[in-house]
Every structure is written in structure tokens, then in C-alpha cells.
Amino acid sequence: MGQKINPTGFRVGVIRDWDAKWFADKADYANQLHEDLRIRKYIEKNLADASVDRIEIERTTKSRVDVSIQTAKPGMVIGKGGSEVEKLRTQLAKLTDTDEKGRSKRVFINIVEIKKPDLSAHLVGQQIAGDLERRVAFRRAMRGAIQRATRSGAKGIKVMVSGRLNGADIARIEQYTEGTVPLHTLRADIDYSWDEAMTAYGNLGIKTWIYRGDVLPQKKNSK
């Protein structure tokens, strides 16, 4: 089961939390879901060069939306004197639905810096995709990503690239593994990502698994 299922969804509720934290009535659910999709799509498109890894959206009231952006380049997102993040907040507010008085929802943005981007599966996959689009040999791109992740402290990493590799006529799959990646162990902190590289010979799929160690339950102090 652990070999087939998405490792992120497999661990939600065990060692990983939801990326969207809100509850809505049946009448409001679809509207809020589409709001989330618009917000995520806008951030991913306009902050494509800011190494954004994860976007969390939380709603405490119907008129407030809290957006947490995890990025390896917080300075690029915040801008000089907070100018860029203020522009982003204004644009995200315009993407939300208005109330009866025509007012948009209040949007609050929290920027979280990623200390070790080489331990993020999405950022590693994006790096490999960028190398492949620049015509770097796929084996060199994969081995370079594995070496950087290992130096950053990864317990294990697996990278899989599929498609017309190096312009071959027949598509195939190549994969490299370093260390251990225990997919069946629920306490194992495994970050997973699927990314895509658009090359002259077609699109290449990139799957990345990074094992960052075990997440053990906190022991309660006995009185």
C-alpha cells in the first residue's frame, strides 16, 4: 500500500497536517474551495522564481483568509520594505468573493523561510526540471540533486524521471536511490513531489521522495 499511495496523503492526520484548514457549510464549500484554487494558482504563477514549496490556507472567520507561504527566498516575496508582499496581499484579496456590501475578504500573509531547500522534494524536483529544460544530461541532474540532498542531511532520497530522455524515440523510466526510503512506515517523515519539465522532445515527469528521519510522538510528563 505504501508503495502505491501518495506518501503525503498517506501521512495526513498522523505526522502531517492539512494544507487547507477550514470548515464550511454545504452552500459555501464550493465557493471557498475555488477561492483556495485561485489563490494557490496565482501564487504559484507569480512567485515561480521565489522557490515556493508549500502554501497553507486557514480560515478562522468568513471574512478572513490567512495564507502561509513557505519559501527558500523570503526576501524576493517580501520585497524592499514589505512592498512586494503588500502588493501580493492586495491581489489575493481581489481573488476572494465579496460579501453583501461588496467588500472583499481580509487576507493576511505569513512568510516562512525554508532553511534547507535541498530537503524539500518540490524544490529538488523543480531544480531537476530546470536542469532538464536547459539540456543538462538527466543522469547528471539526478545525481547532483541526490548529492545535495545527502549533504543537507537527508536519510534517503529516490528520484524517478520518465519520458523521452535525451530525446530518445522510445520513452522510458530512469530512477536513482540513495539511502533508505521507508514508504510503509507512517512515522517516517517522507516529503514527496511530482514535477514536470517541458523540453523540445516533450514533457518529462519527475517524482521525488526524500526521507528526513522519523517523527516520534512527544512523551507526556508524568506528575
From Swiss-Prot:
GO terms for molecular function: mRNA binding; rRNA binding; structural constituent of ribosome. One of its GO terms (cellular component) is cytosolic small ribosomal subunit. InterPro entries: KH_dom, KH_dom-like_a/b, KH_dom_type_2, KH_sf_prok-type, Ribosomal_S3_C_sf, Ribosomal_uS3_bac-typ, Ribosomal_uS3_C, Ribosomal_uS3_CS. Binds the lower part of the 30S subunit head. Binds mRNA in the 70S ribosome, positioning it for translation. Part of the 30S ribosomal subunit. Forms a tight complex with proteins S10 and S14. It comes from Leuconostoc mesenteroides subsp. mesenteroides (strain ATCC 8293 / DSM 20343 / BCRC 11652 / CCM 1803 / JCM 6124 / NCDO 523 / NBRC 100496 / NCIMB 8023 / NCTC 12954 / NRRL B-1118 / 37Y). Residues 39-115 form the KH type-2 domain. CDD domains: KH-II_30S_S3. Gene3D superfamilies: 3.30.300.20, Ribosomal protein S3, C-terminal domain (3.30.1140.32). GO terms for biological process: translation. The gene is rpsC. Keywords: Ribonucleoprotein, Ribosomal protein, RNA-binding, rRNA-binding. Belongs to the universal ribosomal protein uS3 family. The keyword ATP-binding does not apply. This is Small ribosomal subunit protein uS3.
